[in-house]
Curated annotation (Swiss-Prot):
<dbReference type="InterPro" id="IPR011344">
    <property type="entry name" value="ssDNA-bd"/>
</dbReference>
<dbReference type="GO" id="GO:0006260">
    <property type="term" value="P:DNA replication"/>
</dbReference>
<keyword id="KW-0233">DNA recombination</keyword>
<feature type="domain" description="SSB">
    <location>
        <begin position="6"/>
        <end position="111"/>
    </location>
</feature>
<feature type="region of interest" description="Disordered">
    <location>
        <begin position="150"/>
        <end position="171"/>
    </location>
</feature>
<keyword id="KW-0238">DNA-binding</keyword>
<keyword id="KW-0235">DNA replication</keyword>
<comment type="function">
    <text>Plays an important role in DNA replication, recombination and repair. Binds to ssDNA and to an array of partner proteins to recruit them to their sites of action during DNA metabolism.</text>
</comment>
<protein>
    <recommendedName>
        <fullName>Single-stranded DNA-binding protein</fullName>
    </recommendedName>
</protein>
<dbReference type="GO" id="GO:0006281">
    <property type="term" value="P:DNA repair"/>
</dbReference>
<dbReference type="GO" id="GO:0003697">
    <property type="term" value="F:single-stranded DNA binding"/>
</dbReference>
<keyword id="KW-0227">DNA damage</keyword>
<comment type="subunit">
    <text>Homotetramer.</text>
</comment>
<keyword id="KW-0234">DNA repair</keyword>
<dbReference type="InterPro" id="IPR000424">
    <property type="entry name" value="Primosome_PriB/ssb"/>
</dbReference>
<dbReference type="Pfam" id="PF00436">
    <property type="entry name" value="SSB"/>
</dbReference>
<dbReference type="GO" id="GO:0006310">
    <property type="term" value="P:DNA recombination"/>
</dbReference>
Length: 171
């Protein structure tokens, strides 16, 4: 099997602000959020502990976006699997602008880690099969009701026939 390449990003970090939820004209949710990842090291010359933080723009779509908007807050720790995408647009002054984002869509994963504002200890939202979402949870009776609601709304996600996959090899 020939591969066109791999575009996969895996991050674990903390949200820098509450997720921003918007809706597209077709009613599907979109969430924009920023995720901070940090690395620590000890400076060999001074012995001083150093830290470097990177900020990542994350965009979630569909059910993942709805759940992120409802349950994630500034400071929430989250695991993200998605793909890297660069967008280009013109600003109000006509200058070309670029931004690089991690897109979490069909095939992407979001897992909440260490939610300190409720009794949810871990929740996984995985939209790999495009027919609905799978949610694993621990210690959240109230969340069961949300799962039933989301499972009964499977028709809100894309059916496999709506997604056009091009399986042809480009040579």
């Amino acid at each position: 099997m020939a591969s066109r390449g791999v575009n996969k990003v895996i991050l674990i970090g903390h949200l820098g602000q509450d997720p921003e939820v918007r809706y597209m004209p077709n009613g599907n949710a979109v969430v924009n959020m920023t995720l901070a990842t940090s690395e620590n090291w000890k400076d060999k010359n001074t012995g001083e502990n150093k830290e470097k933080t990177e900020w990542h723009r994350i965009v979630l779509f569909g059910k993942l976006a709805e759940i992120a908007g409802e349950y994630l807050r500034k400071g929430s720790q989250v695991y993200i699997e998605g793909s890297l995408q660069t967008r280009k647009w013109q600003d109000q002054n006509g200058l070309e602008r670029y931004t690089t984002e991690i897109i979490v869509n069909i095939g992407g994963t979001m897992q909440m880690l260490g939610n300190r504002n409720s009794n949810l200890q871990a929740m996984t939202v995985n939209d790999k099969n495009s027919t609905g979402i799978k949610i694993k949870k621990t210690d959240a009776v109230e969340f069961d009701k949300k799962i039933e609601t989301h499972e009964s709304n499977k028709d809100l996600t894309h059916s496999p026939s709506e997604i056009d996959f091009d399986d042809e090899i480009p040579f």
